[in-house]
Regions:
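Secreted, luminal/periplasmic, and some membrane-associated catalytic domains
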Residues: 34, 70, 77-79, 101-110, ...
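Short, structured active-site-proximal loop/turn typified by the sulfatase FGly-forming signature C/S-X-P-X-R
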Residues: 51-98, 102, 148-151
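His/Asp/Glu-rich, glycine-adjacent segments
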Residues: 92, 98-240, 335-338, 511-512
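Beta-strand elements within well-structured catalytic alpha/beta cores of enzymes
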Residues: 34-48, 61-63, 87, 142, ...
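Substrate-binding rim/cap in mid-to-C-terminal beta-strand-loop elements of soluble/periplasmic
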Residues: 297-333, 399-440, 444-445, 465
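Acidic, Ser/Thr-rich low-complexity intrinsically disordered segments
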Residues: 466-513
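Non-catalytic, well-ordered alpha-helical segments in soluble enzyme domains
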Residues: 48, 60-61, 140-143, 314-350, ...
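Bacterial Sec-dependent N-terminal signal peptides
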Residues: 1-31
Length: 513
């Protein structure tokens, strides 16, 4: 009897093993989602209206089958380095402390803002006791879980580095920065030297995708690969939105995206790769002539370009010793100027949406109130709906040909598309989402804890495996105004609210004579 029992038990176990091999999910093997890899793909400066069958056929076709975020947000200020740090940390600048493409750290330079190249960021890191960002990043969380992240970027060294600033067991591959240093010779040997800029500079995009195909898109590759192509941003800055050069750049980066999709298909990896598509910001046409530094000097509110009484870092204004009277004078002068849009200051009290200076809204309203690094004033250029010569709407009063950084819907409202084994197909999400939600969502997919300091949320509505009930968001408008002898300055800020999460949609200024 005992012999018969053990023989039967052995047969039963054999059957279970066979079934487990055929139906692994049903028999408690490692969570399937933990095996799926993720590709994050950013097209720098991608306006939603670029995604058409004519301009970007590969991305357009992808969008038809993907799930789409209909109400996705760039992080304000709508500049590249803010958004690379924000998506990487799942946090806003008020939390992670990287406040612009130009930044002010007096320990590095007392009288001027500095850039955000890798070399600049290393100076900041040294001056800040090795704490470049005051928030934990996706790369750090993955490394602590025994996983890794690789970044493939054709943009600036700073943008590439901020996506995984600790690097750890991962890597960064950029035409001007390869980390760790020990990986550099291997990349240059196997991928080849970075192409010369040439007429249009597109070679760097292909080189970066070559590296992705070699090191990222494979079964034993990193759990997360992040790609960031610096066009159409570069071409639109120089030649304008809708210019033939910008259209050509769109076509080229779309072809590179097509190469990635083809490679996933050829390698049989489409069923094990999630893909998240977005951008750092939209774009507007520029028509301005004013410069903030020159304006303050002309008004007697800053001594000269090299003085440290007032330091300008893009739209951020740092007033020496936080002198309240000088801050008020600067705000008053800005309110009168038609080229100036929204003006923000520190909160009237903790958590307040109103700024402490009359006629301003708070840094809290825009997630900008870093305890140590925020300036005293933040200024956005005024904007309108004017259409450029190529029929693209959205104009502001910054200098140059075209760009971003402001608080218009043309810069804040951006594309989001997701596809893959962990995401629903063909779902159109009307809830507000942001670039800060990307990292928490990935951590949710992989069953990793979301650090408490992260500001973003898990976009559970996109996930196949979700038990959360349907939710609704609401709109809210915050208004402030102040009267002057010349008239009234009125500032409105439109936001979407989902539970405890606030999303900045746009701001609008009226001057009433």
């Amino acid at each position: 009897m005992k012999k018969y029992f053990f023989k039967s038990l052995a047969n039963f176990c054999s059957i279970l093993v066979a079934l487990a091999l055929v139906y692994p999910d049903a028999y408690g093997q490692t969570n399937k989602s933990a095996k799926n890899k993720t590709l994050i793909f950013f097209f720098d400066g991608l306006r939603p209206d670029y995604i058409t069958a004519e301009l970007m056929p590969n991305l357009y076709a992808f969008k038809q089958k993907a799930s789409v975020g209909m109400h996705h947000h760039s992080v304000f200020p709508t500049v590249t380095r803010v958004n690379s740090a924000s998506y990487a940390t799942g946090s806003y600048p008020g939390t992670h402390g990287l406040l612009g493409n130009a930044i002010y750290f007096p320990a590095v330079n007392k009288s001027k803002a500095i850039g955000t190249t890798y070399e600049d960021l290393m100076k900041v890191q040294e001056s800040e006791s090795n704490q470049l960002l005051t928030a934990v990043s996706l790369g750090e969380v993955l490394q602590s879980a025994g996983e890794k992240m690789m970044v493939f970027s054709s943009g600036t060294t700073g943008q590439a580095f901020l996506q995984n600033h600790k690097v750890g067991n991962g890597a960064i591959v950029n035409p001007e920065l390869i980390l760790p240093e020990s990986f550099k010779s291997q990349v240059l040997t196997e991928i080849g030297d970075v192409p010369q800029k040439g007429e249009n500079g597109y070679g760097k995009h292909k080189w970066v995708i070559d590296a992705l195909l070699k090191y990222g898109l494979k079964n034993d590759g990193p759990l997360v690969s992040a790609v960031w192509l610096s066009d159409p941003d570069g071409s639109a800055h120089r030649y304008g939105i809708g210019s033939k050069q910008a259209i050509s750049a769109l076509a080229f980066v779309d072809q590179q995206f097509g190469r990635v999709l083809d490679s996933l298909q050829t390698r049989g990896l489409t069923t094990v790769f999630n893909i998240i598509i977005s951008t750092d910001h939209g774009f507007v046409t520029h028509t301005g002539k004013q410069n903030l530094t020159d304006f303050l000097i002309s008004q007697g509110l800053k001594k000269d370009k090299d003085s440290d009484d007032v330091v300008i870092a893009e739209g951020a204004v740092y007033v020496k010793d936080h002198n309240a009277e000088n801050i008020k004078k600067i705000v008053s002068a800005l309110h009168k100027e038609n080229w100036v849009g929204a003006v923000f200051t520190k909160p009237k009290k903790k958590g307040s949406m109103q700024g402490w200076v009359y006629g301003t809204l708070s840094f809290e309203a825009i997630h900008y109130n870093h305890p140590r690094r925020s300036g005293d004033i933040l200024v956005a250029p005024n904007w309108n709906d004017e259409i450029n010569d190529k029929e693209y709407p959205g104009t502001d009063f910054s200098r140059g040909v075209a760009g971003h950084g402001g608080s218009s819907p043309y810069e804040i409202n951006i594309a989001l598309m997701v596809s893959g084994p962990d995401f629903k197909s063909g779902y159109h999400d009307t809830l507000p989402t942001s670039n800060v939600d990307i990292t928490p969502t990935l951590l949710g997919i992989y069953g990793l804890p979301v650090p408490t300091q992260m500001d973003g949320r898990i976009m559970s509505e996109f996930l196949k495996k979700t038990s959360e009930p349907a939710r609704k968001s609401r709109k809210e408008t915050i208004v402030t105004e102040v009267k002057y002898p010349w008239g009234t300055y009125k500032l409105s800020l439109d936001m979407s609210i989902l539970d405890q999460y606030r999303y900045f949609n746009f701001s609008k200024v009226e001057r009433i004579q």
